[in-house]
Amino acid sequence: MDKKMRPVIKASLHYLALAIVSVIWLIPVYAMLINGFKSNFEVLSTPVLVPPTKITFEAYVSVLLSLAKPLINSLIIVIPTSFISAFLGAMGAYFFYTLSYSFSRASSAISDVLFSLISLATFIPQEATLLPLTRLIVSMGLLDSYIGIIFALLIFYIPTGALLMSMFISVIPRSLIEAAKMDGTGDLKIFMKIVFPLSMPGFISTLIFIIIQAWNNFFIPLVLVTTPGMKLTSIAVLSYSGAYGTLYNDTFAAGMVASIIPLAIFVFLGRYFIRGLMALGGGGKGV
């Protein structure tokens, strides 16, 4: 009887843990959602998790009107940044992969050194690059421009893409690449026809990760944007809290609106993200 009940107890504890984690994760989302439907007075006079006594849409309407341009700006910047970072990161990961399996010991050593530098670059705080990054963007005449912000984000997210994609590309069977090279296929064609399609689950996982990171990035747009028309969502939300007071219902509504796109991406594409991680954990069986 004990042996029969053991799997049931184990499964029950598993689902209980998932339920607890889900509730903890959903509490901030719930708080943002319901407080956006309150008046500013009610937000201040009632507990944060208590539903509104009277639902009002004023905060959400006001926020949607004021955040329309920042939302568009964020999409214009985040979409190309994410795809370019993930794709170039995949190409870089394949470059390290081919070097590490080279017959030359020097090439393998160079690959290890370069990959270590790339890995180290992902841990450098963006704040530490404030002065050189700003001077670079200003000298290029790209301050307050989409290209300037995208370029700055690429500096940080291409290494991230390479680091993540290297984990997925490294589990691709070496025999496939060697067979293609024996047929006279070039590295670029091998990457486009063999490596990239096989590592697609990893590419999608990397893409989702970079999209969420780029969407939530606060430092880069804070430094490189000086005009209101170029504000991104992460910066625009900050405008609801100032030295002369805070519109709490608008702040909650703005936080909810700003979170909709990354939340939607993870809800609809989260299974591909998990599939990519499972493929990696299975030694590439799902890749």
From Swiss-Prot:
One of its GO terms (biological process) is transmembrane transport. The chain crosses the membrane at residues 14-34, 76-96, 113-133, 149-169, 194-214, 218-238, 250-270. Belongs to the binding-protein-dependent transport system permease family. The keyword Coiled coil does not apply. It is a multi-pass membrane protein. This is Glucose import system permease protein GlcU. It is found in: Cell membrane. InterPro entries: GlcU_transporter, MetI-like, MetI-like_sf. One of its GO terms (cellular component) is plasma membrane. Keywords: Cell membrane, Membrane, Sugar transport, Transmembrane, Transmembrane helix, Transport. Residues 71-269 form the ABC transmembrane type-1 domain. It comes from Saccharolobus solfataricus (strain ATCC 35092 / DSM 1617 / JCM 11322 / P2) (Sulfolobus solfataricus). The complex is composed of two ATP-binding proteins (GlcV), two transmembrane proteins (GlcT and GlcU) and a solute-binding protein (GlcS). Its main location: membrane. The keyword Methyltransferase does not apply.
